[in-house]
Amino acid sequence: MNNGIDPENETNKKGAIGKNPEEKITVEQTNTKNNLQEHGKMENMDQHHTHGHMERHQQMDHGHMSGMDHSHMDHEDMSGMNHSHMGHENMSGMDHSMHMGNFKQKFWLSLILAIPIILFSPMMGMSFPFQVTFPGSNWVVLVLATILFIYGGQPFLSGAKMELKQKSPAMMTLIAMGITVAYVYSVYSFIANLINPHTHVMDFFWELATLIVIMLLGHWIEMNAVSNASDALQKLAELLPESVKRLKKDGTEETVSLKEVHEGDRLIVRAGDKMPTDGTIDKGHTIVDESAVTGESKGVKKQVGDSVIGGSINGDGTIEITVTGTGENGYLAKVMEMVRKAQGEKSKLEFLSDKVAKWLFYVALVVGIIAFIAWLFLANLPDALERMVTVFIIACPHALGLAIPLVVARSTSIAAKNGLLLKNRNAMEQANDLDVIMLDKTGTLTQGKFTVTGIEILDEAYQEEEILKYIGALEAHANHPLAIGIMNYLKEKKITPYQAQEQKNLAGVGLEATVEDKDVKIINEKEAKRLGLKIDPERLKNYEAQGNTVSFLVVSDKLVAVIALGDVIKPEAKEFIQAIKEKNIIPVMLTGDNPKAAQAVAEYLGINEYYGGLLPDDKEAIVQRYLDQGKKVIMVGDGINDAPSLARATIGMAIGAGTDIAIDSADVVLTNSDPKDILHFLELAKETRRKMIQNLWWGAGYNIIAIPLAAGILAPIGLILSPAVGAVLMSLSTVVVALNALTLK
């Protein structure tokens, strides 16, 4: 495939680009390529700005987006309790979608049932000072234990049924086997003692009651932790108000439910109110707090024509907006859908934990049976049953099964709240072993917006303010990025341009008009030379070397000023590059700008490898070359013109997406334009991996130690675990994993 890059034959190519200590790359730059630059074609650009590399500084076009519904998110979707959504196959039997309030109620009612059972029955035949007996107390224990087994054991019995139905027996099956063996044997002992009062067959009612109560408590705590793991997303779902103020056609207000709002409706949002939907400001100006939805900590200034995001908080101004995205297709819904999909995917570590958890059931089953047979010969039937039940209860595939999904739920939620959106969850795992970060210059390292970088007055009869008034008169009605940059500069300087009359385009070279009764032109270098105007080539070269686009102001056929416009480097870019280097990741800059402009930016930022004059296909080829060298590459770009290279890289990251987060080619989407968010993603990926490894070690290590102990391997030295203690340890193992996930920040 010809990508326009030929590292073998540089001498026959035009526009040698880049600076690479190891090797150089060249690009075939035809006339067509010179018209297709880093940010695509600019259809309506006035012709006087076609000089030099002007097309290379194109304005990014982040289209508009629509997004999603947060008003109808129920508990199971948000909390991650349904493990099938978390890619947790082994826990499929556990009905985590049960409302936590119902589970809490089941625990408390089971505890009430368990208290008299504990008071009226001995533990393993041992009597305690608090034990109470009376005629018929054994019947009370039987009835209460039966109710407790059916009611309190229901989640575990139902879970086991589902696991077996799916041919994936795991923790719920083990627990169900344990409590069923304890209950059935206890009923047998009750009948045997009833038939022959002179013999005493020990029951397990005490153990059964404590087992069920402790496991219900453990799973309630765990469910709460799982819910908290996605707490950030739960808060996102609660950001939208229930009612809004809608403007009627006659201008009066009406209060309506958010569900009644449609695209095109006009709403009024007062100071301090939450933005009910995505929209565009029609009237007013304000400062909006978007921290809860995009992670942008600073207030964002908004005025007429700007977009607002549903769920953000209006600041000190009252505004009127036109709805562009309702709860069903707004930004928040799109974020939630993206996060749900990411949480549903599986990483390599999760596949590993699922396999181990699946085999753990069979290990526990075999060890439990072996323990039963061994203790039947070494002791008696009650002791043998106790060992087997304890093994079944203490084995916890759940801890292993939850090890990864809980961390994933937490990390994806944290990422989403901070404007780091994962479209491919494996990107989080791959981000820990990166070798190279490739950065598209415009929009990533620079602001992506033109501004006036220099004005050189060539005629002492004119002052800078007057020069700007002339330029503003010509550019006031133009709509290309350079004109926008000039007019924004005038606005910042609070300069009102002159009025232009008889304005006309000079085909391919610039603009001309009558301003203040003088003939005024703004033209490019080609036209200036044609008119015989004297231009200092060294001065022009200096401007261009800094990545500037240069135009010339001519008043009454006399060259009076040179104006340079450039894309300003972001203040935080230099610190970002230094931080990347400290992580032993090589920064590489890619740009459609000319090599001299690329060199100026790269040298200022401390980037040793850079390539200029590139088209999208060229960038993809460069990414592929690094991949062919065995490097793991993250490509950061705008997600639109960089789509091929984003898709080709190990990780594709779109930066500065704003609300337009539906970027198919990216694995990660950053809503803000701050390159430091890339560092935040890398740090979160590192911490996420650390938590995953910790949880895997805990889940595996716990079972390696706990199962032999439950089988009675240390009985010779007097260390024997009862089923109740086994239940406590099993519950604690899942709680530890859950709480460890919650410490991820």
UniProtKB/Swiss-Prot annotation:
Q: Which UniProt keywords apply?
A: ATP-binding, Cell membrane, Copper, Copper transport, Ion transport, Magnesium, Membrane, Metal-binding, Nucleotide-binding, Phosphoprotein, Repeat, Translocase, Transmembrane, Transmembrane helix, Transport
Q: Where is this region: Disordered?
A: 1-76
In Swiss-Prot or TrEMBL terms, this protein is called Copper-exporting P-type ATPase B
Amino acid composition bias (Basic and acidic residues), ranges on this chain: 36-76
Q: Please tell me which top-level EC class this enzyme sits in.
A: translocase
Positions of region (3 X 12 AA approximate repeats): 60-97
Assembly state and interactors? Monomer.
Its gene is copB
**Record-annotated residues binding Mg(2+)?**
D638, D642
Entry's transmembrane regions: 109-128, 140-160, 171-191, 201-217, 360-379, 389-409, 704-721, 724-744
Q: List the signal peptide residues.
A: none
The record, for SUPFAM superfamilies, names:
Calcium ATPase, transduction domain A (SSF81653), Calcium ATPase, transmembrane domain M (SSF81665), HAD-like (SSF56784)
Q: Which Pfam families does the entry mention? A: E1-E2_ATPase (PF00122), Hydrolase (PF00702)
Q: Which PANTHER family match?
A: ATP7, ISOFORM B, CATION-TRANSPORTING P-TYPE ATPASE-RELATED
Query: How is activity affected by pH?
Result: Optimum pH is 6.
